[in-house]
Every structure is written in C-alpha cells, then in structure tokens.
C-alpha cells in the first residue's frame, strides 16, 4: 500500500497557491448578425468607439462606423469571405493607425501601409493615427516659398507655394496625372518628399507612373500609396488618409512634402458605396451628407507650419476628373471651395496640340505672386495679360476680314507666346530656363520667327545660354532677382543665338 505523505502534498499545494497569478481579461465582444458587400452588422460590442478597429474570429479587421441602438455597422478592410453569421468579433480599443518611418521612401504600399512592391517588409518603430487633426491657425504661417512644378504655364501664371492646396481639374485623358508626375520629377534635388496616392485607378496606370518615377530617379524621395479599382471600398476610402499621415510625419520633422491625391472623386464614390450599404440617408447625387467633410478634413491637413514648429510644409495637389467639362457637379464644386485655386485642363486645348492643356483664363492660384521668386514676378507680369488679350482677339478675328497692323502683330505675338508654353511630358524646366523663355517671348524676340520654329529655337537657346553664359544661371539662383547684369547677358545670348539660328535655317 502506497503511503500518503501529507507534508509533501501540503507543500505542493502551498507552492501552487503561491504561484497562482489571477489575471482577469475583460474583452468587449459581439456576434455577427449579417455580413455581405463589405459590411457586417454586429450585435454586442457595447462600448465600442466610433472609428474603432474590430477584429473578427478569422483575422479580418473592420472599422466601426455606424453605432446604432441595437447593432453596430462595421466596414471590412478585406473581402471577409470567411466571416460567418454567428461568429464572434472583439473590439481592439485602437483607432486606425499606421507605422511611419524614413524607410518608406522609394516603396509602393497599400492603405494599411503594407508593402506591395515585393521588396520585403518595412521597418518602423513609430505610429501615426490615419486621421489626425489639422494644424490650427496659430500653428500655421502664410505661404511664401515657391514649389516649382517645372511647367512654364503654372510657375509663371498660376504659381503654387509650399503649404498650398491646388486642385488639378479636367476631363479624362487631358494630362492631369502628367502634370502631377512632372511636378514630382521637378522636386529632384529640392529636398522635398513626395507622396503619390492612387485611389481606384487601373493597376496598369499606377505601374506606368511608378516606372516613370523609377526611370528618372524620382522614387528615391517618393512614396506611392496605391489602392486600385479592384480594392475594397473601405481601403479606397482610407488610402488618402494614409498618404496624409506619411506626409505629416515628414512635415513635423521640419521637411517639405508634396502629396498628390489621384483622385478624390473615386474616394467619394467608395465612401458613397459604404454609406449606402450602411443605410445612411443619401443626399445630392446619392452622396452622404458628410462628403464635404470627407474632403475638407483631408485637405486641411496640408499646411505651412509656423517657425516655432520648424517651418515644415505639406503641399496638396488633388486631381478631380470632370464629365465633359462640367465643373458645377457636386464633388468638383466641393473641392474647388476647399482648395486655394485650381488648374483647369481643357480637352479642346489638348486635342488641338497645346500640351500641357492648361486653360490659363479660368485657372487661378489664390496665393498668387507670394509664391514666386522676384525674378519670375519681374518677367511673368505681362504674360497672363497678353495671353488673355490674345484669346479675346483670336475669337474676334475669326469674324473680321481686314485687321489693322497692330492687331495682326498682337495676334502673331500671342501665337508665339502660346507656343512657348508648350512642353513635352517628363521634361520640366528649371526656374532660370523658364525666366529666359518668358523674357524671350514677351519682349518680341520670337516675332521674327515662324510659329513652327519657336520651340526649336528655344531649345537651342537654352543649351547655348547654359554653355556660353553660365553666369546668368548663377545670378538668378543666388540673388533670386532678374538684375540688369542678367538681362544684359540674356539679350547678348538671344542675339548671338538668333544670328546662328537664321544662318542654320538658310543653309
């Protein structure tokens, strides 16, 4: 018979009691009532916050958007094909946030900041809320530094400043994305971090943009956030906020950032889809009542920070597609009223060979010449006025048969000015080259050339000026002013190049 040693048993029991650690874990849970179309209705989750992340049994994450009396409406961040009626859901206690770090530069990521370029994980130790408050009035200062796009038409007449929000608007296939990518290419060497957010675009279009940026060495300072047309509506809705959170990370580190949203109207459509499925009441064009707030809270995050916060900046270029030039639709009017100006691209100009197809007459920058260097102000002042007068005259000249000499000269000058605004895609110009081009046109040096010769002459003049008069570039870049010395150098170069050009053409 086995002897029971009471002291040994009591020691074991005592040890177990001492080691016992009473941990009580309270989890806020609920049950799936209904799931489908990217939406789940949950019973329970009594203390869930608006916008809180919830986790389903099979691992899918969702966001609690509708808090109703007897259920919670959750939008899914994934297809949710494995979620079943009756399965459990738990609240995480967290609002949507993403990891942020310098390591994101040069990468292509999705709305959850996960890499989708097949180049491995991205290391990050810091997190930022996807939706954070925009800087207040005291935290900002007025926009005063230029953000050069490299496009003459924009930098001279519709200047963009660091911290500004400028809308790019136009019909499909008018070169809106091309204007944005050229602006990214022109930031090379300017110490500006660029974020390109593709919302609901074709995967082939996004791949094309990424390839262009890689070939030109621009991916080194660029982050691409992509949620293509086949992504769930929730992720298309979140993508712009993810891009803004990444740009803010750099802005608060005293850096300059440029963010391009391509395009917010697709985000509004995704949000409309989510809202209608959540049975929120529809408003104009079936968009929910808070669609203005959707875009205003996003674009208000763009700012030029005050000197106490390090003077970082975030410049936003939202791109909105219109239907047959109708800017009075709901989303275009909303975004126009939020932004500090718009660049209007016209299908008629594009089809007539004027590219970039910027309609200078109705494009505007509300920051204006505050976002230009002095040299640009000096030469570009006359340009917009002359082009506006030319557009008016051209319309009138179609009906008039005999025009006086002065009108003919003005029409000839206008045609040449319009010609100098044309640029090839992915060929941005430096400020010095732009100043030289505008000066040559507005001072009548191109009047003696045929319209077809203008671009060829300007290309050769830029090369000639760079090799034979390097002091011109030095003066403009160091003083930011179009001095008399710079003007004399430029006049000399134009005259010398004109003589060479005429001899070449005659030969």
From Swiss-Prot:
Compartments annotated for it: namely: Plastid, Chloroplast thylakoid membrane
Q: Which InterPro entries match?
A: ATP_synth_asu-like_sf, ATP_synth_asu_C, ATP_synth_asu_C_sf, ATP_synth_F1_a_nt-bd_dom, ATP_synth_F1_asu, ATPase_a/bsu_AS, ATPase_F1/V1/A1_a/bsu_N, ATPase_F1/V1/A1_a/bsu_N_sf
This entry carries the following GO cellular component terms, namely:
chloroplast thylakoid membrane; proton-transporting ATP synthase complex
Catalyses which reaction?
Answer: ATP + H2O + 4 H(+)(in) = ADP + phosphate + 5 H(+)(out)
Q: Please indicate which residues carry the site annotation Required for activity.
A: 363
> Which keywords belong to this entry?
ATP synthesis, ATP-binding, CF(1), Chloroplast, Hydrogen ion transport, Ion transport, Membrane, Nucleotide-binding, Plastid, Thylakoid, Translocase, Transport
Keyword Metal-binding in annotation: no
GO MF terms listed in the record are: ADP binding; ATP binding; proton-transporting ATP synthase activity, rotational mechanism
- What is the annotated role of this protein in its UniProt record? Produces ATP from ADP in the presence of a proton gradient across the membrane. The alpha chain is a regulatory subunit.
NCBIfam families membership: atpA (TIGR00962), PRK13343.1 (NF009884)
What is known about its subunit structure? F-type ATPases have 2 components, CF(1) - the catalytic core - and CF(0) - the membrane proton channel. CF(1) has five subunits: alpha(3), beta(3), gamma(1), delta(1), epsilon(1). CF(0) has four main subunits: a, b, b' and c.
Would you identify the family this protein belongs to, as annotated? Answer: Belongs to the ATPase alpha/beta chains family.
Mind telling me what this protein is named? Answer: ATP synthase subunit alpha, chloroplastic
């Amino acid at each position: 018979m086995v002897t029971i040693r009471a002291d040994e048993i009591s020691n074991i029991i005592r040890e177990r009691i001492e080691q016992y650690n009473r941990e009580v874990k309270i989890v806020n849970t609920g049950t799936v009532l209904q799931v489908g179309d990217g939406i789940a209705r949950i019973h329970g989750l009594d203390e869930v916050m608006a916008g809180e992340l919830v986790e389903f049994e099979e691992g899918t994450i969702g966001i609690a958007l509708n808090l109703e009396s007897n259920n919670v409406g959750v939008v899914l961040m994934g297809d949710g094909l494995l979620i079943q009626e009756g399965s459990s859901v738990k609240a995480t206690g967290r609002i949507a946030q993403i990891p942020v770090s310098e390591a994101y530069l040069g990468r292509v990521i999705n709305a959850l900041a996960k890499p989708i370029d097949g180049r491995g994980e991205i290391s990050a130790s810091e997190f930022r809320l996807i939706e954070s408050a925009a800087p207040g009035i005291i935290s900002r200062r007025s926009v005063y530094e230029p953000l050069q796009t490299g496009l003459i038409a924009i930098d001279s007449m519709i200047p963009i400043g660091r911290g500004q929000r400028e809308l790019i608007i136009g019909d499909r296939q008018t070169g809106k994305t091309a204007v944005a990518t050229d602006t990214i290419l022109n930031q090379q060497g300017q110490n500006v971090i660029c974020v390109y957010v593709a919302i609901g675009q074709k995967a082939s279009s996004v791949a094309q943009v990424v390839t262009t940026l890689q070939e030109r060495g621009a991916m080194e300072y660029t982050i691409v956030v992509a949620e293509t047309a086949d992504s769930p509506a929730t992720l298309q809705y979140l993508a712009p906020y993810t891009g803004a959170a990444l740009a803010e990370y750099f802005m608060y580190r005293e850096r300059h950032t440029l963010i391009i949203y391509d395009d917010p109207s697709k985000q509004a459509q995704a949000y409309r889809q989510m809202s209608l499925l959540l049975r929120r009441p529809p408003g104009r064009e079936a968009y929910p009542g808070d669609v203005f707030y959707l875009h205003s809270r996003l674009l208000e995050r763009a700012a030029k920070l005050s000197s106490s916060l390090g003077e970082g900046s975030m410049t936003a270029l939202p791109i909105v597609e219109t239907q047959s030039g109708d800017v009075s639709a709901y989303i275009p009017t909303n975004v126009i009223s939020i932004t500090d100006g718009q660049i209007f691209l016209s299908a008629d100009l594009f089809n007539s060979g004027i590219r970039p197809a910027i309609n200078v007459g109705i494009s505007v920058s509300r920051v204006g010449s505050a976002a230009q260097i002095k040299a640009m102000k000096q030469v570009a002042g006359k340009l917009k006025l002359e082009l506006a007068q030319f557009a008016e005259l051209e319309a009138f000249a179609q009906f008039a048969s005999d025009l006086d000499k002065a009108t003919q000269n003005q029409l000839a000058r206008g045609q040449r000015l319009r010609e100098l605004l044309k640029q090839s895609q992915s060929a941005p110009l430096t400020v010095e080259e732009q100043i030289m081009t505008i000066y040559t046109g507005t001072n009548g040096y191109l009047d003696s050339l045929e319209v077809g010769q203008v671009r060829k002459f300007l290309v050769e003049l830029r090369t000639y000026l760079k090799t034979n008069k390097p002091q011109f570039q030095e003066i403009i870049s160091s003083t930011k002013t179009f001095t008399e010395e710079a003007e004399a150098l430029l006049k000399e170069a134009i005259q010398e190049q004109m003589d060479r050009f005429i001899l070449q053409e005659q030969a």
